[in-house]
Amino acid sequence: KISGTANTAQIACDMIGCKNVYVIDSLTASAGQKLLVEYAVKLRRQGKNSKEIHEEIERIKTKISLLACLDTLEYLHNGGRVSQTKAMLATVARIKPVIRLSGGNVELLAKSFNIKRGIKSLAERLEREELNPHFPVYVMYSDNESLANDLTSDIKRLLPNVHSVETVKVGAVIGSHIGTNACGIAFVKL
């Protein structure tokens, strides 16, 4: 849904007649994909076969959620994901959108007028989620590690029982869409 990569991989696999190869559309990005890959590796180490791993990843991918606060919509506009009108209005009003990516769909959750307040709201939203305790929470950032460190501190303060909170810098492709000063959280719901 987010990109055509999974569809392209499936077409290629069908063309060459792959056997025991499963193409999975993760319906997520960045650290959300990291959660899936690490889980697949864990399942393999437990002795699961490719079919069992595929079935479990298909099940768990629907429970992955990604929350993020963006400093600007400029980069989403440049990448064709947001209209020029929306990007311009957000810039003029100094709106910092708080979004959720879940099941391949992007949803606007809130609008903040301050990037630090928007990022702090991510931890507050996470506090209201039913987290799967068997998975870590990943804090992602595009360019400003201090914002990620602040968010990590907020999560640890609000959710002291979270099994693991780790910081991850987003890659160049995601970074080119979300811009600088963006920060987010990837997690698995119950």
Name every feature range the model reports, one short phrase each.
Residues 2-22, 28-190:
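Mixed-charge interfacial surface used for oligomerization/domain docking
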